[in-house]
């Protein structure tokens, strides 16, 4: 019964941004071109996720609720695995209650469905991968590095201000490889990581290129955010800190 009440409450969301994301996503899947026919300044991956959620819930936010549940579950599970690596032993699943409560009480969760919320599993996966590399005697498999590049590309086209986190990830891993004398592996890993980034970017280059909207894409997502957007978390200072 309580789950049905939650679903009923998810039929709407009074946060303006979530409704904008939903409109952008549904418009995209309806044939309109992002940034050219409909305008907002977040990344296209965010709108794609909202559009797919709209296929589940129609015009309400039940599909977004499902998306939030998947994102939070993935974040908590990956966080638990990371904590187990650091502790060197298995941990009870009840430890997940602490980060769950902390994240749910944070400002990014005040309405639900924010870009930061949907980024959590990507950031948790990167952190787990890095901690695992630090505890491993061998180099990371190139496939794993490529996957992290792919996830970093998804984060780039969801909300680019988190790139500072991924830059730190690359620097730490590169320092580890240099310290261990793995120069050849470092070169191959750089190629694999950039390949993953390219895989995440190429579909959007094709999408906007086919519709003649590459200029609209870069103007709205980069130029407008860097130089015109004056809202909280926008502009050049946003590159130095994640909102």
Each predicted region: which residue ranges?
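Short, small-residue-biased leader/transition segments that mark boundaries at the very start
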Residues: 1-7
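Transmembrane-helix signature of polytopic, membrane-embedded enzymes
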Residues: 79-103, 120-121, 137-143
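Short acidic/glycine- and proline-prone juxtamembrane loop motifs at membrane-interface regions
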Residues: 108-118
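Membrane-interface transmembrane helices that cradle and orient dolichyl/undecaprenyl
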Residues: 126-147, 180
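Perimembrane helix-loop-helix junctions
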Residues: 165-198
């Amino acid at each position: 019964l309580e789950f049905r009440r939650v679903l009923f409450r998810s039929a709407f969301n009074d946060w303006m941004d979530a409704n904008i994301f939903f409109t952008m996503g549904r418009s995209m899947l309806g044939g309109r071109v992002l940034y050219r026919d409909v305008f907002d300044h977040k990344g296209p991956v965010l709108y794609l996720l909202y559009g797919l959620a709209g296929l589940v819930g129609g015009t309400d936010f039940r599909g977004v609720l499902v998306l939030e549940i998947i994102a939070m579950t993935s974040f908590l599970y990956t966080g638990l695995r990371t904590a187990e690596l650091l502790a060197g032993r298995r941990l009870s699943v009840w430890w997940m209650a602490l980060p769950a409560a902390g994240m749910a009480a944070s400002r990014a969760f005040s309405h639900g469905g924010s870009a930061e919320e949907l980024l959590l599993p990507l950031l948790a996966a990167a952190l787990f991968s890095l901690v695992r590399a630090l505890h491993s005697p061998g180099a990371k498999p190139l496939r794993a590095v490529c996957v992290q590049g792919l996830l970093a590309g998804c984060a780039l086209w969801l909300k680019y201000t988190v790139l500072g986190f991924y830059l730190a990830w690359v620097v730490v891993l590169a320092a580890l490889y240099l310290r261990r004398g793995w120069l050849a592996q470092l070169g191959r890993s750089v190629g694999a990581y950039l390949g993953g980034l390219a895989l995440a970017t190429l579909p959007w280059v094709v999408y906007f290129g086919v519709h003649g909207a590459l200029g609209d894409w870069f103007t709205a997502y980069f130029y407008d955010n860097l130089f015109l957007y004056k809202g909280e978390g926008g502009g050049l200072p946003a590159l130095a800190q994640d909102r």
